[in-house]
């Protein structure tokens, strides 16, 4: 693995350990060059309560690797999380910088009713 990826994974591991100690439901984000994925994971980490990505049928037809797509994913995951009875989450950015697509997804999820 490249040094950049190793350091990102190390940052992610430290953040997830802290969230595990707090026993918080977490909104986990992963981004690739073409898509973005979001999952709401239970406090013990054993169950995915809600998920959304640019691979979903509703979002697949449009552009998938930009800020607009990340905003749509954020709104969709917030809607699905609220339907599952989750309103408060810890934001797990998976070691990515809080900037660009990751920030757009987080802002849209907040607008959709999730509290961080």
From Swiss-Prot:
Keywords: Ribonucleoprotein, Ribosomal protein, RNA-binding, rRNA-binding. It holds the Pfam family Ribosomal_L18p. CDD domains: Ribosomal_L18_L5e. One of its GO terms (molecular function) is 5S rRNA binding. The keyword Ubl conjugation does not apply. GO terms for biological process: translation. SUPFAM superfamilies: Translational machinery components. It comes from the Bacteria. Gene3D superfamilies: 3.30.420.100. InterPro entries: Ribosomal_uL18_bac-type, Ribosomal_uL18_bac/euk. Belongs to the universal ribosomal protein uL18 family. This is one of the proteins that bind and probably mediate the attachment of the 5S RNA into the large ribosomal subunit, where it forms part of the central protuberance. PANTHER family: 39S RIBOSOMAL PROTEIN L18, MITOCHONDRIAL, LARGE RIBOSOMAL SUBUNIT PROTEIN UL18M. HAMAP family: Ribosomal_uL18_B. This is Large ribosomal subunit protein uL18.
């Amino acid at each position: 693995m490249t040094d950049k990826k190793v350091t990102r994974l190390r940052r992610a591991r430290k953040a997830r350990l802290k969230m595990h100690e707090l026993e918080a439901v977490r909104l986990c984000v992963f981004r690739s060059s073409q898509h973005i994925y979001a999952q709401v994971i239970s406090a013990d980490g054993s169950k995915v309560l809600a998920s959304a990505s640019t691979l979903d049928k509703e979002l697949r037809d449009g552009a998938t690797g930009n800020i607009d797509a990340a905003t749509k994913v954020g709104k969709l995951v917030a809607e699905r999380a609220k339907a599952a009875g989750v309103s408060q989450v810890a934001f797990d950015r998976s070691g990515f910088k809080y900037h660009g697509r990751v920030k757009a997804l987080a802002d849209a999820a907040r607008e959709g009713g999730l509290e961080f």
